[in-house]
Amino acid sequence: MLISVFAGAVGLAVHVVFLFSIFDIYFKSPIIHGLPAYEVPLPAPASRLVLIVADGLRADKVFELQKNGTTRAPYLRSIITEKGSWGISHTRVPTESRPGHVALIAGFYEDVSAVTKGWKDNPVEFDSVFNRSRYVWAWGAADMVHLFTKGDHGKRVFACTYDNDEVDFADEDASRLDTWVFAKFEAFLASASTNKTLKHMLQQDKLVFFLHLLGLDTNGHGYNPDSMEYYENIALVDRNIKRVVQLIDEYYQEDGKTAYIFTSDHGMTDWGNHGAGNPSETETPLIAWGAGIGQTRLSGKDGYYDGYSEAWNLSLYRRVDVKQADLAPLMAVLLGIPIPINSLGLLPVEYLNRDSHFRAVALLTNARQILAQFKQQEHNVQETTFSIFFRQFKADAKKIELTEMMETLLKQSRYKEAVQVIEKFIELALKGLTYYQKYDRLTLSIAVALGFVGWMTFVILLLLRNYTGIMCKSLESQSKKMTPEWQGKIKILSSSTLVIFLSIQNAPFMYYFYFLIPIVLWTMVLYELDVYYEAKAYLRRFEVKMWFLALAVLAVLGLELLVITFFYRGVMSLGLVFIGLWPFTTQLSKRMSVAWLAGCLALGVFPLLPVIGKQHNYTLCVAQAESVCLYHTLTLALSVWQRGSFSKANFFHVLLSLRIFPLIFYFSKTSNANIEHKEGLPLFNQILSWLLLVLSPVLCLFSTTSLFNRLLNLTLSLLVPFLLMCIFYESLFFLTLCLVMFLWICIEHQLSGSTLRLQDMTFEYQSSSTQAKNVTYHIKIDDVRKAYFFMFFMLVAFYGTGNIASLNSFSISSFYCFMTVFRPFTMAAILLIKVLIPLLIVSCAFRALLQSIRVSNTALFLLVFIMSDFTALHFFFLIKDSGSWLDIGMSISHYLLSMGMFIFTAVFHGLAWFLTTFSLDFSGHEFKRHLL
């Protein structure tokens, strides 16, 4: 028991620290404070800017022609062909609203730590175009508009928003959200005629009008981007943008000082989701016109070979693509305000209609603003590094050379050549900035890797000492064993030296943990060094080196297979084939071996199926419900036949669950039908769905703790909320997984040679004598296999119906039985429950397995921890912060999942223990609660 608690406490601390280490190593915040502001020292091209962001609008949907050859957005298309500039704005992962708006208006890509606040807030205040403007008026959703009112000490941002409750995915007409914005804007301009203060403010320069349009995002989620609702919403936006331009021209008497930018924060998948890095999510439209914006130009060689322009019939008009963050310096230059100090955007000079001199000066201002970040970051690194260890950016000489070239070209008025040199200079400065942001990466990575290896080595030695019979105390091991006194001296000396070294360098607080943890772990390993020599002597004494080497190679190959499954979902099917063939190498009966193989092959079909996206098949769902009812009816009959009796509580629970299943699919089908017909979510369905979600898992606690009965009731209890979220083949996967878990329990029990029948076993709390027996338990090679199977089935449960990259593939209709109003955290919680229910089934089956064969829980979980950390170490070095945004998101997800296996395993085992051993019982009028 003490071993389990100690290893668990140390392991939890290590994993929590290393879990967050990637945010210091790979994803540091790009925000630097105390920087100077730079603005173009020339007259501004525009006095005001209208920024229109159509949330969730895909580039192809607004640019492409319909089947009849007409466009969905005639006004916007006329701007492209007659008086403006256009292109694609490429966003970054995560393709969510907040990061997209921050990139647009502040010019930098948010650090991943913002995910802890649901991408709804940033841990650090930041500069933006709005901060630098004289006045900003914003209309739209509160979540987006109020992003930029935080820290508005100058009271320059005036927000007009609607409540989040208005965002309903089942709304009959979600485009009314956009109509509301346009109506408020029109009323705003009309009120200026009677409001002298407002009229005076509107006559100033450096003004921004921000229109956030959420209708397209809402319709896309509710009906998908190929729906008529989405297309009609595009047409509505197009008509109202034309009206906005007319209103502004009338108010300002066509003074030609208004610039317009129309874009989107992110796109959307075909099934109505966003968040990942598919092209449909990262490619958004950009159309700019008005003051300071270049006129329509016929296309020359623009360097784009993706075929988009031709497909959209726009190849005649020059296209200029940008990164989303590039729009912040563009807006700042148009208004003549300082570029946001943390902006990483490169000014797209081709969008400006000014001469080459203005372009060169504007781009030079952009270069100075980025160079200021570079110098400050370099200074920060120097402040925390000993001069003898400081490694300067290698391209500093190139930077000096480019600086001299810029100055020479500008003096000679060779502005076009100067623009090219300045762009190279900015590119170099950005590389230097990235270099210093990653300055400590190698050192920290080595420290974390040493910590991983130290932890795994310590756990292996712990297993060898306490759960094997190799400790015979040979003379060699006794002579090599470190005394506690020496262990303490080494730990204190090394830790003190490191702390002094880090404090002198003013290292961040978390760095102490990253460097101290490996020292502590390896000191513990040195203390257990006698185990290593005993193991070596054991291998030498019994001449099993080659056998051990072969097993080690097999184990590594098996773990590498786990790593590959994170990248290629179908590999799980191959693994299930091998696992299905395993019983044929044992003494198991042929009938059971064939049943196991059939179950594994059936389960292996699901990773080969497409991930569940926008597909709906409620007929299949009903058929699955009938199969579930039949399966559990047969199970109930079998239990009565084998035991000769069945408790009233169990019978009532099973009967109640079976009667609920048809109702579940009725609610699910009617809820989705009502939403599709724009009739909204029925209140009765919603209330009952929430009640079933909360109360159903509790029903299993009223059954007895008999192993089979409790598992049957637990399966039914968890299946009820799971079915409420099913839209395709998920329940069939759930049923197959339950069947395989049942077979696994039976097989392991038969192989254990236990004389006690499974039907007679209960989930009882282990007595002290049993625990004492488990302390002296010696692990076998078969136990390594059991731990591997558990980890493999956990991955199958997690990714059996979903996308291996992220949870992005889940359809929003999965929670239509519960809600349609936009509540991101509640929606995420519901989807998380859907994902975690199969994991809980595997954990409960593993709990039953451990109970039936009486092995040491601690030993098996230590084996699981070693395996999960082996995969985590892989993903730690496979994390990416460059390349495609999809790859970046996948690498983070893989690492977090593999690291979370340690915590998930412990949490799910504890939850499984509670659900299998805890009972609630009614006896007369007395309510009893007992823990067996």
Describe each PLM feature range.
Residues 4, 24, 37, 41-44, ...:
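A long, amphipathic alpha-helix that forms part
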Residues 157, 168, 180, 184, ...:
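C-terminal helix/juxtamembrane-tail motif
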Residues 51-53, 208-212, 261, 287:
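Structural motif
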Residues 55, 104, 211, 241, ...:
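Divalent metal-coordination and catalytic microenvironments
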Residues 112, 347-438, 446-450:
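Phosphate/adenylate-binding glycine loop and adjacent helical scaffold
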Residues 256, 262-305, 312, 316:
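Histidine-centered active-site microenvironments of extracellular/periplasmic hydrolases
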Residues 5-19, 28, 46-51, 58-206, ...:
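Active-site-proximal alpha/beta segments of enzymes that process anionic O-linked groups
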Residues 9-24, 439-932:
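Alpha-helical transmembrane segments of integral membrane proteins
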